[in-house]
Amino acid sequence: MLYICIPSRNEAQTVGLLLWKIRQVFTDAPREYHLLVGDDASTDATPDVLAPYTKVLPLTVLRQDRHAGYARTLERLLRHAVTL
């Protein structure tokens, strides 16, 4: 299993396209994968953009209520990945 960790903050305009591109890459790949997106207290529509993707992709969204920064968000994603 390959875990792809994606920290994000206010990425409503780009995160959907990124997830779809990753899906395209793995369509022909024989490897199992799981996407982990860390929403670092986005104030835009990032959570709304991510929600429908959880139904069609192997995707987990970890939302933070307070801005933690890139490094802490990535660390949280990595820690979560090792528990799966």
Residue ranges and their predicted role:
Residues 1-84:
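Structured catalytic core of nucleotide-sugar glycosyltransferases
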